[in-house]
Structure formats: structure tokens, C-alpha cells
Amino acid sequence: MMQDIFKHAEQEAPRECCGLVIEDNDNEKYIPLENLSTEKDEFEMDGETFVRYLLKSKIKYVVHSHYDEDCSPSEQDIIQCREVGIPYLIVSYPDKEYTILQP
């Protein structure tokens, strides 16, 4: 799964990638989503898509990447993670490191 996330981060660089990790039949599965943000250092998921996964799946993590930075959460990440109430998995690319931010 992490390999899929890092591949998505590579494909989207220098923009942030975003997606969801869901539990699917007791397995974790990464779902890449389109980043709707026009800013390269921000991410925005489609709200309808997020709600659809929220209603039909167990979302384990909200995922996004930081390009050419470490994986430390920004103030915006901390605020959004608390608002959503789901852990954030933040990856750095090209360093290929990650951190998990709890709400």
C-alpha cells in the first residue's frame, strides 16, 4: 500500500497528491483521488467522493503528500485533521518518509 501512495506522490509531483486508505475485507487499500486545489502545496478532495467513501467504507486515513519537504504536518493539516476526525497519513516525496497525524 505505501508503494502505491509513493507512486501516486511521484506522479503528481510537484503538486500534492491526495487519497484515502480504506479497510476492504480486512485489508488496507489506497484509493488515489484527484487533487482539486490550484495551489501546488495544498490539497482538496471532492466532497461528494469523500462522503461516498465515508458512507460505504471504513476510512482509515486521509492521505496527502508534501513535495520536497519533510512529512511534518502543517498548521492547516492539524486543523483539518481535527475537523474531519480521521487520522492523516502524510508522506514526503522524494524522501519517501511518512507520519501519521491523529485528530
How should each PLM-predicted stretch be described?
Residues 1-58, 68-103:
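Conserved beta-strand-loop surface patch within small alpha/beta domains used
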Residues 64-66:
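Histidine-centered active-site/metal-ligand motif
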